[in-house]
Amino acid sequence: MAEETQHNKLAAAKKKLKEYWQKNSPRVPAGANRNRKTNGSIPEKATSGGCQPPRDSATGFHREGPTSSATLKDLESPCQERAVVLDSRSVEISQLKNTIKSLKQQKKQVEHQLEEEKKANNKKQKAKRVLEVQIQTLNIQKEELNTDLYHMKRSLRYFEEKSKDLAVRLQHSLQRKGELESVLSNVMATQKKKANQLSSRSKARTEWKLEQSMREETLLKVQLTQLKESFQQVQLERDEYSEHLKGERARWQQRMRKMSQEICTLKKEKQQDMRRVEELERSLSKLKNQMAEPLPPEPPAVPSEVELQHLRKELERVAGELQAQVKKNQRISLLNQRQEERIQEQEERLRKQEERIQEQHKSLQQLAKPQSVFEEPNNENKNALQLEQQVKELQEKLGEEHLEAASQQNQQLTAQLSLMALPGEGHGGEHLDSEGEEAPQPMPSVPEDLESREAMSSFMDHLKEKADLSELVKKELCFIHHWRDRRHQKTHHLLSEPGGCAKDAALGGGHHQAGAQGGDEGEAAGAAADGIAAYSNYNNGHRKFLAAAHNPADEPGPGAPAPQELGAADKHGDLREVSLTSSAQGEAREDPLLDKPTAQPIVQDHQEHPGLGSNCCVPFLCWAWLPRRRR
């Protein structure tokens, strides 16, 4: 485009130059000088630059040419005209040079403009390319915007539909809200009415409960003071009883020392009796030898028949005494052997029972937790009854053994004392006559195991160990009684409470159900009651044991068997078994707690299941658990 415009401009400039040269071409006619003279305007025409049109000169030349009457003046001055023309042409040339210069300048300007236009065109082309690229990117962006617009329109339609649904739901929810508010207002009104009605009742109930709690608190305080006083009295009684026990122990030790001294004397007497028996045997052998010897030719004085009969009787008596003494010694040795076997068996049973007790003590620690107490109270009551029965059985067996040993020792001592009280056996005829008339009496003897002082001391230590074991068993029995009584009392208290329920009583969590009414005072009262009950049961059991120990051999205690039964048991070589069910029934008949409503189903359940008495897996309740439970 720029090149075409440049060519067009150059062509236009060339045309202008041709026209200018044509206009300024030199054509002067012959009658020009005359015209200049007449007109008087020759210098003006020359100065005007010869701009006369060629048509006029041509017309003047042709107008004067055919005429032959041209003046000489006009023809005489052609040189002057040409000089004028030359001057005019020089002027025109200078003007043309100026115009050429101006044209060259214009050309330079035009070329400069062309270069600038080229640069501008290049810039425009570059800008055009950039614009085309931008147009393409804009087209792509336009397409993307169209797609986005389409998606936006679709989403707008979706949201419009959703907003319509939400508006409908909002209307429904507002309607539902209005309905619920109306219902709520009605319910609140009814509740206010009911609250107003119940407030009066609740006030009366709370006042009644408050009064009852105050009464119970006063009763508990009174009971606490009474229990403290009784606890102090029991402590004093315990001190007195401990002093009494110390005195009894010293008395028993003195008696045992006396018995040991008497046994030593009896041993000496036995040795003397053995010597007498040997002397009698020697005399008997001498008599036999004398009787067996032949009579001399001169017989001496023959003894009378009375003397011979007396000697025979004495011989028979001595032989009977020897046989009775041998039999008695054998019987006593057998009794001692059986007693030792039974003691060993009993020790083995006690050892096994201690192992079971240790195992059950571990299980009891788990059962002592509140969860186990709440879960299986009936099983615990049954186990407590079972353990109590087993402890009673062991106590009866130990009591039987102690009573049997004591009765045997008492019989031996009484027999020895009675024989010691009799007059000594002489060698005279009167003494032989009196002995012959009386029935033959057996000679007392001491067990072979008691021949030495060491055996006697070991036997006494064994008896002390058994006594200590029986005391421990009685303590455990007393604790079981106390624990069962405490459990029944707490369950009965829970059942008798106005706000209590049968479920809590059935669960058996007595000390866990203590509320704010008891507090620390209730715990202290419970601890004092526990100590009093345990100590009273312990005193009763120990008094019974002392009474059984002080009973003579011919008058056995109420819990001990007769000597004939003991002898029969010794012949069979085993201990008499005790029925746990019968003891449990007897205990149930004697137990004052059966009048309570909570104790009856427990005893009934125990009677319905007699196999529980033979079960060895029994939880052992030790004294160490009691203070921990009180915490």
Curated annotation (Swiss-Prot):
GO annotation, cellular component aspect: cis-Golgi network; Golgi cis cisterna; Golgi cisterna membrane
GO annotation, biological process: Golgi organization
Keyword terms, alphabetized: Coiled coil
Residues covered by region (Disordered): 1-76, 352-379, 423-445
Coiled coil: 86-148, 224-411
UniProt feature, compositional bias: Basic and acidic residues: 352-362
Pfam families attached to this UniProt entry: GM130_C (PF19046), GOLGA2L5 (PF15070)
Alphabetical list of InterPro entries matching this protein: GM130_C (IPR043937), GOLGA_cons_dom (IPR043976), Golgin_A (IPR024858)
Keyword Coiled coil among UniProt keywords: yes
Family: Belongs to the GOLGA8 family.
PANTHER family: GOLGIN SUBFAMILY A MEMBER 8H-RELATED, GOLGIN SUBFAMILY A MEMBER-RELATED
Protein name per the record: Golgin subfamily A member 8T
Gene, per the UniProt record: GOLGA8T
